Amino acid sequence: MADEIDAMALYRAWQQLDNGSCAQIRRVSEPDELRDIPAFYRLVQPFGWENPRHQQALLRMVFCLSAGKNVIRHQDKKSEQTTGISLGRALANSGRINERRIFQLIRADRTADMVQLRRLLTHAEPVLDWPLMARMLTWWGKRERQQLLEDFVLTTNKNA
């Protein structure tokens, strides 16, 4: 397996997952609980779960996808765009999320941040560039959180 997780293949695998496995995965309330679900391992095994460097990223990605089958909708980057739609832009474009909730998300501690993010995803049902979001989730540190806030605020101000 290459050094990077194939985010689109993971997205498609999630979309094609049977309803029973989806339901098992959706029931978890935080990312580490996925480790107790056999269907989770069947889903992530082809994406390099054995590589310890991929495990946290895969936990975060699947936890976000587990908000629902059609909650996160992928849209390819258009030819006139330099980048696809980021998570921050998508949340702002939804018109359902306010700045205070984004601020709370970026200030939250580990685990709580993913729980809050999944709630935001469920509420906003964003249309975004999934590989771009997956890359953000791979690292999910201070810089990625700041980028989320920056994209959200700049998009909100542009739409106002």
From Swiss-Prot:
Disulfide bonds: none annotated. Induction: Repressed by H-NS, activated by LeuO. Activated by the BaeSR two-component regulatory system, possibly due to envelope stress. Part of the casABCDE-ygbT-ygbF operon. One of its GO terms (cellular component) is protein-containing complex. Pfam families: CRISPR_Cse2. It comes from the Bacteria. GO terms for molecular function: DNA binding; nucleic acid binding; RNA binding. InterPro entries: CRISPR-assoc_prot_Cse2, Cse2_sf. The keyword RNA-binding applies. Disruption phenotype: Loss of resistance to bacteriophage lambda infection, loss of plasmid silencing. Increased levels of 57 nucleotide crRNA and also 2 and 3 spacer-repeat units. One of its GO terms (biological process) is CRISPR-cas system. Keywords: Antiviral defense, RNA-binding. The keyword Cell membrane does not apply. Belongs to the CRISPR-associated CasB/Cse2 family. CRISPR (clustered regularly interspaced short palindromic repeat), is an adaptive immune system that provides protection against mobile genetic elements (viruses, transposable elements and conjugative plasmids). CRISPR clusters contain sequences complementary to antecedent mobile elements and target invading nucleic acids. CRISPR clusters are transcribed and processed into CRISPR RNA (crRNA). Homodimer. Part of the Cascade ribonucleoprotein complex, with stoichiometry CasA(1),CasB(2), CasC(6),CasD(1),CasE(1)-crRNA(1). The CasB homodimer forms a cleft that cradles the 3' end of the crRNA. Interacts directly with crRNA, CasA, CasC and CasE. Stable subcomplexes of CasBCDE-crRNA and CasCDE-crRNA also form, both of which are able to bind target dsDNA. Binding of target ssRNA or dsDNA causes a conformational change in the Cascade complex. This is CRISPR system Cascade subunit CasB. It comes from Escherichia coli (strain K12). The lineage of its organism: Bacteria, Pseudomonadati, Pseudomonadota, Gammaproteobacteria, Enterobacterales.
